[in-house]
Amino acid sequence: MSDTPLRIAVTGVTGRMGKEIVTCIVKEEKQFSQEIVLGAAITRLNTNICGMDAGILINTDALGIEITDNLESIKDNFDVLVDFTAPDISIEYLKFCVNNNKNIVIGTTGFNQIHKNIILNASHKIGIVFSSNFSIGVALISKLLHKITQVIGNTSDISIIETHHNRKRDIPSGTSLTMQNIIVNALRSIHSNRIIDSNLDSTTYSPASSYKDILIHSIRAGDVVGEHTVLFAGPGERLEITHKASDRLIFAHGALRAAFWVGRDKIGLFDISDILEMDTLL
C-alpha cells in the first residue's frame, strides 16, 4: 500500500450526495485512518460557484481546493473519482477517467442498457465500482434475497415497495431494480413461473423461461432518504425484509470505502459485495 493518501475527486458537489461525500472526507477522515483526502471538487450545473473554496460549501475552514467545472485543470490532483450525478454526465466523467487512467466509483442510478455497456467496456481498462446503493445494510439484504427466493420464491407472491424523497428523478429506484434482478435470477435457478415486467430487458431474460410476477411499487414523498421493503406473501404467512436509510452519510461512507478499496491499481468491474467480500457469506 502506498504511504501517500488516496486523493478523491468528488463530482456534483452542490448536490445532496456530492456535498455529503465532501463533508465525509473532510470531517470524518479518522474513520479512514487519514488515508484518503479531498483532491478535487467538481460541478457541472452550478458554474457560478466555480472558484469557491470547497470548505465554504460545507461550512468549514478553507481547504485550499477550489470548486471547478474544468476536468483538465485538476486531472493531476486526484487518484479516484466518486460520482453521484446523472447518467449522461456520469458517462462523460467515466470517459475522462478512461482517457486519463483514473479509477472511478459510480453511485449514479437510472442508466439504460447502452450506458451499462459503456461502463462494462470501460472496466477492461480501469477499475470501476458500480453500485445502485452503497449501504452495507442493503448489500446484506441483497445477499439474503437470493437465498430466501430459492427457498420460498416459487410459493410466494413477491413485491418490492420503495420510498424516496420527492425530488428523486428515477422511478423505480436503482436499488429496487437491483433487488428485482437478484430475485429474478434466483427464480430462474429454480425454474419458477413466468415473470412479466416492462423494466426487464427482453434480450437478457428469455421469454421461454418461466417466472413469477414481481411488482415494484414506488412512492415519492417528502424528504425520505430511502426505504426498501421486499414482501414474500405465501399461504398463511408473509415475510417482509426492510431497510430504512435515515442519513445519507451511510452512502457516503460506503462510496469512500469503495474508493479506498479500488484504489489506484485495480482493473475490472466491481460492486459493493466485492468490497465486503460477501461471496463467503451464507
UniProtKB/Swiss-Prot annotation:
This is 4-hydroxy-tetrahydrodipicolinate reductase. InterPro entries: DapB_C, DapB_N, DHDPR_bac, NAD(P)-bd_dom_sf. Keywords: Amino-acid biosynthesis, Cytoplasm, Diaminopimelate biosynthesis, Lysine biosynthesis, NAD, NADP, Oxidoreductase. Homotetramer. It comes from Blochmanniella pennsylvanica (strain BPEN). Its EC number is 1.17.1.8. One of its GO terms (biological process) is lysine biosynthetic process via diaminopimelate. Catalyzes the conversion of 4-hydroxy-tetrahydrodipicolinate (HTPA) to tetrahydrodipicolinate. Its main location: cytoplasm.
